Amino acid sequence: MAAKLQDLELSSEEVDRFSKAFKDPTFREMFIQYAEEISDPENRKKYEQEIYKMENERGMDIKFIHPKPGYVLLSSVNGVQKCYLNICSNDLIQKPEFKPGKDGEGKAGLHWSLPYSLSPGRDDLSKDWSKHVIYDVVFHPDTLHIASKNGKFKGIVDSTALEAVASQFNVTLDKANVRTLSMKYKGVPNPSVLRKPLPEASPKSRDLEDPLCFPYPYDVPTAVGTEKKDQKRVIQKECKQHLVTPEQDPNVQVAATPNYTVRHRSYVDLQDFRDSRDSTPSPVPKELVITVDLPLLNSAAGVNLHIAGKNLSLESEKPAYKLNVKLPYAVEDNQGKAQFNKVKKQLIITVPVIQHNILSLMQDHFQEARGEKDNQNKAEHSVLNKEHTDNSGITSARGTEKLLELEEENQFEGLASISSMDTGASHLPEILPNLNTFGKEQVVNQMNEDTPNVPTDNLVCPTFTCSQDPTSLTLIVHVRDIDENSICADVGSNHYHIRCYRKQSRAFYDLLVTFLPHDIIISNEVSVNISEDNVVIGLTKCPESFGFWKKLYFGVSGQSLQERRFVIEENINKVLACSIPLSQVSPSIQEHQPLIEVLEMTDEKTHIRLNEPKIEYVDSAEHNEQCTDHSESERDTSLELPNVDGKDSAEQCSSQVSPCKHNIELGREHTSERDKEPKPTSCTAESTSGQQPNDSHLVCPGDNCAQDSNAENKMACLKSSVQTTQESDLDEDDMPDNSDHLQNSASSNNILKEISSKDGSVQVISDHTTHCPFQFQNSLLFELD
């Protein structure tokens, strides 16, 4: 009962009033009398006579058209619900007329004019409480008589009724599934009214004080307007009704496309709202719900449904339905379910969505978009060839961000392997031979042709920073006051080349950035933003190259390129794996080797802390006693570490060291003080070979009478101090190394070139001297900084 009263939209107070009224016997008697009066034919005649008199007083002539049953057509309105068309007859409608004529092919025939009358649609309920709409189309009885004798003429009558209802009430009827029922009339007959103004009648003046005076609910038609409308209708009928279309032919049946809706359904999971990177709700729904409206079906027995990947197809023979839908996501066709709602005449299909990775979905999307753009680029490229333009894709950017695509043929074809992490970063590796020959010469020559006035000998490589994410790469060239008109850029699938100069100093800058062959960029999706401080270049990675890239090569075109590795986990792990064993370093160097602690490592900087150890030596007897004490119980030792970093910070910090069997005291002294007054220190350490040390005293590193056993003890002491600083946080640069040859090479090269950041001028400094308390064993850490 609740479902039946749902569409009434009654409030609780109205329901209470109705329930109380129908419980009253007096109200029930009055209600029965009212129903009998309105259904009595005699009372209806009196009602019509009274209406006729009132309309005459207003100057209107009305006629009540009572439809006589003929036959019923079944269809659907707007693809949602059933629709019944009662084809009726009445003598008040004009008779059909015909005129001989010819069709478009010159065949002789008859042009029929079929007058009709329409009544507004009314809603009704079927036995299963489903809604449907009923329309009455009234013709002259002679029209229905001819239709009963001639099948083609009946098709003209049916198409006329369908077109009249669709055009007059602005609805869409399913003409493909029109079916003639065996019944003669659907619902309760309801008369319609024809109104025409009387030509010589004078309407009665309205008295505003009369309580029965109310405004006329209908527009007062004029005789001229009525004649024009009738003529227009007759012309439309004559133009449309004399031909039998394929849709009207009963032998030809065209399937209708039903209405459908696709809904995305997901479920709330509290794990998607955690404070974590991987806890974001997925934009991909869990399942798709497809609702198909099939108003002419009573069950889903004759429906063929097929789902494969992203395609859904539905077919039905009687009634004829056909639907092909491309779903937005690939679905599990074997795990779906379908259910037919008999009340709403809907087929509800629920299928789960295949949960792909978001990155793979982006790759599919970019591949489809790239395929379309490649076709456009090929067409543009053919036009450029006709105009005798180069296919290098070089263009001058005048404050814009549009760059043409450069075709990179035969470039990076000889890549076989990647060089090891131990190699230096200031040369072009041998694994890129084609870059030195064809590809690089083509880029340089084309760039020189576009900028003929630029001196190639005075080109300077600007400083730049590079950052990346899985789908894009950003280059920031740190050059101020760049002339927008001077920018000349070249982009390819594996390289980007830019050349420009400053406004005031006219200093020319040239930067060529190349990538590995499998690291591909989309050449027609490049953005260039120019500001007073820098130039920001945005590159989009190809979908096949999504992810974090390992390295790139940069430099001035025509010169050797340098290697720059991205700070990613894989590169850092390789650097840390290249550690130098402590046994290969001499004890004298271990004594002066500082302890290096890496605090922060990014693309822009590397923050380290240096700790200079102070070693104290003690007698062998004390050493044995302390070793015995430590064998019984382990002690925690504190390590005082001064903050020595690249920022000259004066903060002091200390860290706790894990328990060990060595008692180590570390301090810090200035180099000048240690050179002037070397002080003897003591240290207690166990021999690495397990033997007891000699009884002789250990002296300071500057003492020439130090024995070999003292050196072994010092190395063991220093090794234990390195082990106490949590080996998991140290890399190969923290370990002691032999830096004598690095110091000699650094001292021999005292000539420096300094480039001014204001005007780009170069200043040569020949008397420059400096002192560094440590040396990098691996130059890669310095290059990353």
Curated annotation (Swiss-Prot):
Compartments (UniProt record): Cytoplasm; Dynein axonemal particle
Any one Gene Ontology BP term: cilium-dependent cell motility
Keyword terms, alphabetized: Cytoplasm
GO cellular component: cytoplasm; dynein axonemal particle
Tree of life domain: Eukaryota
Biased composition range(s): Acidic residues: 728-737
Keyword Ribonucleoprotein: no
Compositionally biased spans, kind Basic and acidic residues: 622-638, 662-679
Pfam families documented for this protein: PIH1, PIH1_CS
InterPro entries assigned to the protein according to its UniProt record, in alphabetical order: HSP20-like_chaperone, Kintoun, PIH1/Kintoun_subfamily, PIH1_N, PIH1D1/2/3_CS-like
Keyword Ribosomal protein listed: no
Residues covered by region (Disordered): 622-698, 719-749
Polar residues compositional bias, start-end: 681-695
Function: Required for cytoplasmic pre-assembly of axonemal dyneins, thereby playing a central role in motility in cilia and flagella. Involved in pre-assembly of dynein arm complexes in the cytoplasm before intraflagellar transport loads them for the ciliary compartment.
Family the entry assigns: Belongs to the PIH1 family. Kintoun subfamily.
Protein name: Protein kintoun
Gene: dnaaf2
